[in-house]
Amino acid sequence: MDTTTLISRLEAASSSFHNLERQLADPDVAADPQRLETIARERSRLEPLVLDYTSLQKVEAEQVQAKSLLKESRGDAAMEELAQQELQELDRHHADLIQRITLALLPKDPRDERSVMLEIRAGAGGDEACLWAGDLARMYERFSSRRGWSVTPVSANEADLGGYKELILSVKGDAVFSELKFEAGVHRVQRVPSTESQGRVHTSTATVAVMPEADPVEVQIDPRDLDISTARSGGAGGQNVNKVETAVDLMHKPTGIRVFCTQERSQMQNRERALEILRAKLYERQLAEANASERSARRSQVGTGDRSEKIRTYNAKDNRMTDHRLGRNFSLDPVLEGQMDDVIDACIAEEQRGKLADLSEQAD
């Protein structure tokens, strides 16, 4: 990004920031909680960038002074050395600020701020694949807890020996998609199953889909396209188990997408959940089509984002997790405990490098 464009964007961000601060002082805004929250969130997003811009201006002024001092110190070896050291330090600080600001100004995915529907399906490997799907679910629940996100199961098809044939989790919080989007794809595990008496290593897979939540305005569903039926929900016991038809089985006829929702206590709640899942699945389809048409022109995407892409191998024997998109290994045990920060940070850094490469090509 050239200097003129950089400064222009910083000036625009600074102007927006100060305008938002004026709005926050407006009594009419204070009387509208929803508007107040929206403005406060946008102000918080811009604040680090504006502070860095202020620091950049200060450093550039100090660089001018340091260069002047260096020029005046010619002939005085001690003073010249001190001035040179100060200028070098200021140059390093300036370069760091430019790098940080450039990354902050890179194009943002508008979906990054959204909550997600996280779908985990057992793949190849039979019962062990179902257990592996359960392990992945726990990994994401622990990671989400560390982030302060809320996780709610919205649809679950449990396996007889444990784990899940299919599980859909609603993960709600700030910028969930910005981090979990890198999890979409096939996760392969190599380990000795607990049911294996000969100690042989088995390979199993589970598929993860990460669907940003879509609102009814973005994905409109014609009621005539739906087949909706009800069924009795199973449970752990009690008077209402299998007596009241609270489960909802929803079929979207144009796409053949089926959603079966049993987790809520009432039929109405399960119907709303099923529609929420369907909207997310339809939205994911739209995004996949858009990504496919754009992918050849972009370097910024980490992997394809497709649920069929083999993204990771988890090797229990060597306590190693390999991310094939990054070509890097990570310690397995911490990752399975939800300590995924290093992995996610590496994916974000790779995405940023790609965006910088895209910008450089556009500049050329």
Curated annotation (Swiss-Prot):
Modification type N5-methylglutamine: residues: Q239
Residues making up the signal peptide according to the UniProt record: none
UniProt xrefs under SUPFAM superfamilies: Release factor
GO MF annotation list: translation release factor activity, codon specific
Keywords (A to Z) from UniProt: Cytoplasm, Methylation, Protein biosynthesis
Compositionally biased spans, kind Basic and acidic residues: 306-315
Subcellular location: Cytoplasm
PROSITE patterns the record matches: RF_PROK_I
SMART domains: PCRF
Post-translational modification: Methylated by PrmC. Methylation increases the termination efficiency of RF1.
Cellular-component GO terms for this entry: cytoplasm
Pfam families from the UniProt entry: PCRF, RF-1
Region (Disordered): 289-315
InterPro entries linked to this entry: PCRF, Pep_chain_release_fac_I, Pep_chain_release_fac_I_sf, Prokaryotic/Mito_RF, RF-1
Protein family: Belongs to the prokaryotic/mitochondrial release factor family.
NCBIfam families xref list: prfA, PRK00591.1
Cited function: Peptide chain release factor 1 directs the termination of translation in response to the peptide chain termination codons UAG and UAA.
Name of this chain's protein: Peptide chain release factor 1
Organism of provenance: Synechococcus sp. (strain CC9311)
